[in-house]
UniProtKB/Swiss-Prot annotation:
Residues 26-46 bind DNA. InterPro entries: LexA (IPR006200), LexA-like (IPR039418), LexA/Signal_pep-like_sf (IPR036286), LexA_DNA-bd_dom (IPR006199), LexA_repressor (IPR050077), Peptidase_S24_LexA (IPR006197), Peptidase_S24_S26A/B/C (IPR015927), WH-like_DNA-bd_sf (IPR036388). This is LexA repressor. Residues 80-108 are annotated as: Disordered. Belongs to the peptidase S24 family. Its EC number is 3.4.21.88. Homodimer. The keyword Transmembrane does not apply. The active site is at residues 159, 197. Gene3D superfamilies: Umud Fragment, subunit A, Winged helix-like DNA-binding domain superfamily/Winged helix DNA-binding domain. GO terms for biological process: DNA repair; DNA replication; negative regulation of DNA-templated transcription; proteolysis; SOS response.
Length: 239
């Protein structure tokens, strides 16, 4: 199964070769997928090659061959332009147009509770490809939120268990693009994969730190990580 970005790149290469007979340049691929650097394109091409979708032809510049396309290929699928907060769609169904998290809405209980949109699932483990979609709303105590816009995510994985965040929990996130060292954040890696981790700085780099010794801390250049919001609350259902 391909991630959204992998599929976008594969179809962009395929359509360009149909039009001109030659693959696009790395700069063209970077711009088409709205990535910050060509290193992200190199990683996507390597992943496509490992999965048997493309082949690099030796001793030739810009030499790529598309071997196969996804089974659900549609010519109408085009690389996205721009960026939006990213999580996995709750139903794992067809991606819907992205929309910014809506402000929390008061509910009819004397203003003590507010409704927060659940935007899907977030990885607390290995980062997972992500899209944004408002699946449903939940009601939370108003004093949990404070100021700003908020959204909720359902946790998938066990990498944050030592921080008290378990698989199946719902985390409440304050929307924002900045974080302080030690904050637990929603982080987008390479404009492709979303994960819930503790934010640290290692010199000029950014470290995404798990709260489970089974997972390694991952270090990235600052251009590869975008903060999507900070953890402000957690809801757990007992069955």
């Amino acid at each position: 199964m391909l991630t959204r970005k992998q599929q976008e790149l594969l179809l962009f290469i395929h359509e360009r070769m149909k039009e001109s007979g030659v693959p696009p340049s790395f700069d063209e691929m970077k711009d088409a997928l709205d990535l910050a650097s060509k290193s992200g394109i190199h990683r996507l091409i390597t992943a496509l090659e490992e999965r048997g979708f493309i082949r690099r032809l030796p001793n030739r510049a810009r030499a790529l061959e598309v071997i196969k396309l996804p089974e659900a290929y549609s010519p109408s699928i085009q690389p996205r332009r721009g960026f939006s907060p990213s999580v996995i769609e709750g139903s794992l169904g067809k991606p819907q147009p992205a929309a910014a998290p809506a402000p929390a809405k008061p509910v009819a209980d004397n203003g003590n509770s507010v409704s927060v949109p659940v935007m899907g699932r977030i990885a607390a483990g290995v980062p997972i490809s992500a899209i944004q979609n408002n699946t449903h709303d939940i009601v939370v105590p108003a004093d949990m939120l404070g100021s700003g816009e908020h959204y909720a995510l359902e946790v998938k994985g066990d990498s944050m268990i030592d921080a008290g965040i378990f698989d199946g929990d719902t985390v409440i996130i304050r929307n924002g693009s900045t974080a302080s060292p030690g904050d637990i954040v929603v982080a987008l890696v390479d404009d492709e994969e979303a994960t819930l981790k503790r934010f640290r700085r290692k010199g000029a780099s950014i470290a995404l730190e798990a709260a489970n010794p089974a997972y390694e801390t991952r270090i990235f250049g600052p251009d590869r990580v975008k903060v999507q919001g900070k953890l402000v609350g957690l809801i757990r259902r007992y069955h």
